[in-house]
């Protein structure tokens, strides 16, 4: 009997705080970051098929690799190796429906890898716990463990070492998507170049951010948003300055480049304010698409029969 296809929904992330240290011996940078999972999601389905491989649909699908470099396919291989299976016998097919921006600094590829791990764990009836899956996830990519966990978390090391963080509030965001993506390695390289030439400002300590999250006050949190990669992203994409300025002028409490960019995230006081900011920002001509999101939300989770009841995140095309 052929197993029933398994579908997993997995969220995007935004970095509320991202402190980038110097380059380590392994080539990675030491990070201190605060992740929050947002209500922008991909859906990943795995099933047994005669032809193994990956298919991608949704916004930006043409830019997503479908070969061995795809993180979801790396997840298939990694899990197969861990449990001694051959993913080609019988074949595993991965179908990705994109709702998270591609190359946008919101960990869409990592999210797909996390979803593939969880889905295959059920398809193959491996009964691995989340901690064991998280260990495999960390070997695939720095952001993959958080996509599994979701919520709000403090990340250290490469970002893969996670501690859950208390957030007493639903935080409301407006997400501005740029017309073109940025590749994460290039942004880190640009930050290294900027630091060699000058001493760009670095974000402060993380403890005040954790206190603001515990307080549940978006105004307090807005004062503390910070991202060491923002200077590099803006250097590579100068138009982001205009986007960040436009979001604040539209009424957001604060704006930040999400991760390595170029997506910009704007924190708002409440849901109504987010809708107003999104409407004004969409008419400013500074980005391709505007979406409204909230967080924190859970990490990767199985999709059951609630699909018809699931709200679609609002978006406006500029």
Curated annotation (Swiss-Prot):
ATP binds at residues 101-111. Gene3D superfamilies: 3.30.230.10, GHMP kinase, C-terminal domain (3.30.70.890). InterPro entries: GHMP_kinase_C_dom, GHMP_kinase_C_sf, GHMP_kinase_N_dom, IspE, Ribosomal_Su5_D2-typ_SF, Ribsml_uS5_D2-typ_fold_subgr. It is an enzyme of class 2 (transferase). GO terms for molecular function: 4-(cytidine 5'-diphospho)-2-C-methyl-D-erythritol kinase activity; ATP binding. It catalyses: 4-CDP-2-C-methyl-D-erythritol + ATP = 4-CDP-2-C-methyl-D-erythritol 2-phosphate + ADP + H(+). This is 4-diphosphocytidyl-2-C-methyl-D-erythritol kinase. HAMAP family: IspE. Its EC number is 2.7.1.148. Catalyzes the phosphorylation of the position 2 hydroxy group of 4-diphosphocytidyl-2C-methyl-D-erythritol. GO terms for biological process: isopentenyl diphosphate biosynthetic process, methylerythritol 4-phosphate pathway; terpenoid biosynthetic process. Pathway: Isoprenoid biosynthesis; isopentenyl diphosphate biosynthesis via DXP pathway; isopentenyl diphosphate from 1-deoxy-D-xylulose 5-phosphate: step 3/6. PANTHER family: 4-DIPHOSPHOCYTIDYL-2-C-METHYL-D-ERYTHRITOL KINASE, CHLOROPLASTIC.
